[in-house]
């Protein structure tokens, strides 16, 4: 079959990374896969085994820019027929919808109502109306059950138009990459956070909890340097205890070497880093945010979940996780079972075959 996978760019976010893995996985199964981006920007390489196409050197994000991109996408896909077009992230979803191509599915990678809740009231109303108009008539694939529930309850999407397909993970490949040499990794014990410096990711909460926990470990942040983040670290007096280690194309040695991985977001869709850290044998603590962490951390692993926006609870959970033994192997295997690559790729093939 022929697949076209489309997103804004290859920036360092989880949605782009997951879409690239879907593309590579489908290509490895012998399918013809075109990976298309609006603009040439980002940290990730083009997915292996795919034809890579860029619509513009720099994408205009306004009314006219979206329509120019949609025209280019329409022309390119008309000349390169496909069995399924999968777009992800709202900007790319809008461009793909404007292109009016057949067999188009939007992959929803975040909890949209939680994203909207952060906005001022007037802007939140406009954003909600925009999403209802965009997603109200298209088939959707949510990355977690929480995202699917959000689409149905908050945006009025009919349940029969929303499927759930988790992000695919090749655990053998993750563990092999985790074993690669990593001379940049600190020799001293450390706690790890992976995620761009953005309000959603709550570095302010992380730093407040880390300062309060008073742990012997360093805190390592895998994110590009940012003046705002540096200033925030200084305000907490943590300049000597926090390392900004930039974006890492291979974060897995950093995960494997960490005493603990912390996720403290206000909202997610299906946080890849929790699954990847568990696959690397690392303890995890996470805010119980919408959506994904509670689906991943079930049973005894749910002890690592804390309320959102509670630095005291996060500090206590960090101390408790570091004092406890690592989770038993059978618990980790059970937690990871729903997230293997094969079930996800099977599901995408089934959607393409049914269109």
Set out the residue ranges of the language-model regions.
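Conserved acidic donor-binding segment of nucleotide-sugar-dependent glycosyltransferases
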Residues: 299-312, 319-325
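Aromatic "clamp/platform" in nucleotide-sugar-dependent glycosyltransferases that forms part
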Residues: 247, 266
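Short hydrophobic beta-strand element within catalytic cores of glycosyltransferases
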Residues: 283-287
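A conserved mid-protein helix/loop that constitutes part of the nucleotide-sugar donor-binding site
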Residues: 16-21, 189, 193-212
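N-terminal strand-loop element at the rim of the active site
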Residues: 5-13, 17-64, 147, 224-227
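Short His-centered aromatic/hydrophobic patch
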Residues: 86-93, 108
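A short, active-site helix/loop in glycosyltransferases that binds the activated sugar's phosphate group
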Residues: 137-162, 169-171
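Membrane-proximal helix-turn-helix segments that form the acceptor-binding/catalytic region
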Residues: 71-75, 122-140
């Amino acid at each position: 079959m022929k697949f076209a996978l489309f997103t804004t760019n290859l920036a360092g976010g989880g949605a782009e990374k997951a879409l690239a893995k879907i593309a590579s996985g489908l290509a490895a199964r012998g399918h013809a896969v075109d990976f298309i981006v609006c603009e040439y920007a980002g940290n990730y390489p083009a997915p292996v085994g795919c034809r890579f196409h860029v619509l513009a050197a720099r994408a205009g994000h306004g009314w006219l820019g979206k329509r120019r991109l949609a025209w280019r996408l329409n022309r390119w896909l008309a000349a390169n027929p496909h069995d399924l077009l999968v777009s992800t992230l709202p900007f790319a979803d809008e461009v793909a919808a404007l292109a009016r191509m057949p067999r188009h599915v939007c992959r929803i990678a975040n909890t949209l109502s939680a994203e909207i809740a952060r906005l001022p009231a007037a802007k939140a109303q406009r954003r909600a109306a925009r999403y209802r108009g965009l997603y109200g008539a298209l088939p959707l694939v949510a990355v977690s059950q929480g995202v699917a529930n959000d689409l149905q309850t908050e945006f009025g999407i009919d349940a029969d138009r929303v499927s759930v397909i988790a992000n695919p993970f090749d655990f053998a490949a993750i563990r092999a990459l985790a074993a690669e040499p990593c001379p940049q990794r600190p020799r001293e014990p450390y706690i790890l956070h992976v995620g761009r410096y953005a309000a959603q990711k709550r570095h302010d909460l992380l730093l407040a909890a880390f300062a309060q926990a008073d742990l012997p470990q360093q805190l390592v942040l895998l994110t590009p340097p940012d003046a705002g983040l540096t200033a925030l670290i200084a305000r907490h007096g943590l300049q000597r205890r926090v390392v900004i280690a930039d974006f890492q194309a291979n974060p897995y040695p950093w995960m494997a070497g960490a005493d603990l991985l912390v996720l403290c977001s206000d909202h997610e869709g299906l946080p890849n880093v929790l699954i990847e850290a568990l696959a690397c044998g690392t303890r995890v603590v996470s805010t119980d945010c919408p959506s994904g962490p509670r689906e991943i951390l079930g049973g005894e692993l749910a002890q690592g979940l804390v309320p959102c926006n509670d630095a005291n609870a996060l500090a206590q959970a960090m101390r408790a996780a570091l004092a406890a033994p690592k989770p038993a192997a059978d618990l980790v295997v059970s937690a990871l079972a729903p997230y293997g690559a094969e079930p996800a790729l099977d599901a995408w093939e089934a959607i393409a075959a049914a269109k």
